[in-house]
Every structure is written in C-alpha cells, then in structure tokens.
C-alpha cells in the first residue's frame, strides 16, 4: 500500500529476518573471538614455557634443552606446526639419552612471540643463532630440520659454518628440485586464504579442535599410538588454539617462493656429515632420486634413507632417526 492512504509501507518480512540472521552471526562471531582471547590469556598464565624465553631483537623466543650428551643437536620445525617442542617430544626422548637436544621455536611458533620477522631462511637462521647463544647452548651443532626448516638449516650452515657439526634432514624441503620451479606464490591453497585463515583469526580454531577427537591428528598426525602422552596431546591441542596460522606462519608460507630462491644454490660443505630421511610419499610426489642425491652429496659421511612414513617422519621413525644420527656422528664427527 502506498502513502496516499496515510499509512507507511510495511517492511518486507525477509528483510527483517535477514537482519536478525546478520545480528545473530555478528554476536556469535564476536562472542567466539572474545572467549578465545580470554581462554588463551588464562591458558598462557597456567601453562608457562617449559624452556627458556630468551631475548632476540627485543622479542622472546622459546629454547628448550634436554639431555647432557657431548653431541649438541638442534631441532627446527616444519611449516605451521603450532607446538614444535611438543611435536618433537618422542624424538627428543630418544636423542636425549645420548645427546644434548635443543628445540628452538621460531617466532610465531609454540611459546615464542609473534613478530614482524620476514621469516626468510637467512633471517630465521640468524634469530636461531642468537637464541642458542642467549640460552647458553654450546656448539658446534648438529642441525636437525623438519620440512621447511631444511632451508633454515642450509642458511645456518652457510652463515655459521664453524658452528655446525652435522645436518640431519627430516623429510626436508629440497630447494633445487624442479617441483619448486613454478613455486612463486604462497605455500597454502586458496581455500586456506579465503576460508580457513579468516576462521582461525576469528577464534574458531577452538571449535575445530573440539571435534578432532582424543588425538589432535586431524592436521599433523600426532597420536598416542606413536608414543605421545595424553598430557602432551592435550597441550598440543591447546597451543594449536593459540598459534595455529600465526602472522609469522602466514608470512613464512607467503614468501615460500622467495625462500626457495634464497637457498636454491646452497650446498652443504663437503666435509660436513649429512643424513637425510625422506618419506617415500614425498619422493614420489615431489623429488627425483637424482635431486635427493644431489642434496645429500656423496661420500661415506653422506647418507640418504627413504622411509615408509608420513611427511612427519619423526612421529613414527624416532628410534631409527636417533640410532642413525648417533652412528653418523660416532663415525664422522669432525
């Protein structure tokens, strides 16, 4: 009805309903975010870092050392692992029986601060080097890098060659592989950019992890069946809520192409002991045997092992990795 009869037009019912739906969604989204911030603050207060929080360029980086052996091993995590110190626990347990083992959580990982770091290999290597010295961890170091930390390890060995005693790759990223020739964009797919990342930023990671079951294996495969305790898995879930896809992780994924270019021409010193564990599924999908052989290098102190495991080789092959590393360093320590 028009205004000639003296009555105002009635609002359409669908507009009212749409307005109610939008209002409910806004309140729900805001409530989830507020709850996430409050719970994270409480959890951080109740669960302090198990290791040292050392100063690196005005920010705190988490460094956790276990064991007292003569060999000093430094563990570095793969891309987007929210809780590296906890993720490496079964491997640390094996290695610390004969070595001094240090897990360094880069910025934006675990208990370390979120910063504006470039997250390129040379900058991460510099920060790791600073953190190790600040924590009083003595070298030379056997660098043990998972996945993208293979790039960090290459940069570290290139920048601080006198402080590196060996390298063990855990299904590492091989930058000179043809697989990366066209990798100029981010490491994550568009679904992540358009859907998953906004959900995480809005605090919905807690909703997702609430449905992941007793083991937080929906993304990273950590399981009680592989030697993780219930307490460890609960803490992994908690830190996933805190740190999943932090600004640093987002940046590290975004600059993958630049990181590949920065390390493509690097090779380990010919005298450096090198041991590389490659998951069979990774080899089949991304690398040729020749590319792996070039990465590892030749010689009695250069060893390559293909394992029937997931990309997270240390979840199931921790005993084998520990034994192989010990044998390598016993024979080839320089």
Predicted regions mapped to residue ranges:
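Conserved hydrolase catalytic core segment
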Residues: 139-184
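Catalytic active-site module of serine/aspartate enzymes centered on a nucleophile-bearing elbow/loop
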Residues: 298-334
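Conserved HGGG/HGGXW glycine-rich cap/lid loop of the alpha/beta-hydrolase fold
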Residues: 59, 65-111
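Alpha/beta-hydrolase fold catalytic core
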Residues: 1-73, 96-99, 293, 301, ...
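A catalytic-pocket lid/entrance helix-loop region that shapes and gates access to the active site
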Residues: 170-210
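Conserved catalytic-core motifs of eukaryotic protein kinase domains, centered on the activation segment
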Residues: 85-87, 112-118, 179-180
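Active-site loop/oxyanion-hole signature of alpha/beta-hydrolase fold enzymes
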Residues: 66, 106-144
């Amino acid at each position: 009805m028009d205004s000639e009869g003296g009555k105002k037009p009635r609002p359409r019912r669908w507009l009212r309903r749409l307005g109610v739906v939008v209002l409910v969604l806004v309140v729900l989204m805001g409530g989830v975010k507020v709850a996430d911030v409050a719970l994270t603050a409480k959890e951080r207060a109740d669960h302090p870092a198990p290791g040292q929080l050392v100063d690196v360029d005005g920010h705190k980086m988490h460094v956790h050392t276990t064991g007292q052996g003569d060999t000093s091993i430094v563990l570095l995590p793969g891309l987007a692992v929210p809780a590296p110190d906890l993720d490496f626990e079964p491997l640390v347990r094996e290695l610390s029986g004969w070595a001094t083992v240090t897990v360094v959580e880069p910025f934006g990982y675990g208990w370390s601060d979120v910063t504006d770091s470039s997250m390129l290999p040379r900058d991460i290597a510099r920060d790791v080097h600073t953190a190790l010295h600040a924590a009083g961890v003595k070298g030379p170091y056997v660098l043990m890098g998972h996945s993208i930390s293979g790039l960090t390890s290459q940069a570290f060995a290139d920048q601080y060659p006198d402080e590196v005693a060996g390298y063990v790759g855990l299904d590492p990223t091989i930058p000179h592989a043809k697989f990366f020739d066209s990798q100029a964009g981010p490491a994550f797919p568009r679904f992540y950019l358009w859907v998953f990342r906004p959900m995480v930023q809005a605090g919905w990671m807690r909703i997702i992890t609430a449905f992941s079951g007793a083991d937080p294996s929906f993304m990273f495969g950590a399981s009680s069946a592989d030697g993780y305790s219930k307490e460890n898995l609960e803490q992994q879930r908690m830190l996933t809520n805190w740190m999943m896809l932090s600004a640093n992780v987002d940046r590290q994924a975004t600059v993958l192409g630049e990181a590949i270019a920065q390390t493509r021409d690097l090779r380990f010193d010919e005298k450096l002991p090198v041991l590389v564990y490659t998951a069979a599924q990774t080899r089949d999908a991304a690398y040729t045997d020749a590319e792996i052989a070039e990465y590892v290098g030749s010689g009695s102190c250069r060893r390559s092992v293909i394992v029937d495991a997931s990309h997270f080789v240390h979840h199931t092959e921790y005993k084998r990795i520990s034994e192989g590393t010990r044998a390598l360093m016993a024979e080839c320590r320089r």
